[in-house]
Amino acid sequence: MNLEVVVQLGSLSLIVLAGPIIVLLLASQKGNL
């Protein structure tokens, strides 16, 4: 596998993992307000 492919897969996995976490953080902030 090429390094570029590994980087792209890594960035996609990070986005997929970070997406729900960011949504939960935003929801908790709105709930506190």
Curated annotation (Swiss-Prot):
InterPro entries: PSII_Ycf12_core-subunit (IPR010284). It is found in: Plastid, Chloroplast thylakoid membrane. Coiled coil: none annotated. One of its GO terms (cellular component) is photosystem II. The keyword Transmembrane helix applies. It is a single-pass membrane protein. The chain crosses the membrane at residues 5-25. Keywords: Chloroplast, Membrane, Photosynthesis, Photosystem II, Plastid, Thylakoid, Transmembrane, Transmembrane helix. The keyword Coiled coil does not apply. GO terms for biological process: photosynthesis. Belongs to the Psb30/Ycf12 family. PSII is composed of 1 copy each of membrane proteins PsbA, PsbB, PsbC, PsbD, PsbE, PsbF, PsbH, PsbI, PsbJ, PsbK, PsbL, PsbM, PsbT, PsbX, PsbY, PsbZ, Psb30/Ycf12, peripheral proteins of the oxygen-evolving complex and a large number of cofactors. It forms dimeric complexes. HAMAP family: PSII_Psb30_Ycf12. NCBIfam families: PRK13686.1. A core subunit of photosystem II (PSII), probably helps stabilize the reaction center. This is Photosystem II reaction center protein Psb30. It comes from Mesostigma viride (Green alga). The lineage of its organism: Eukaryota, Viridiplantae, Streptophyta, Mesostigmatophyceae, Mesostigmatales. The gene is psb30.
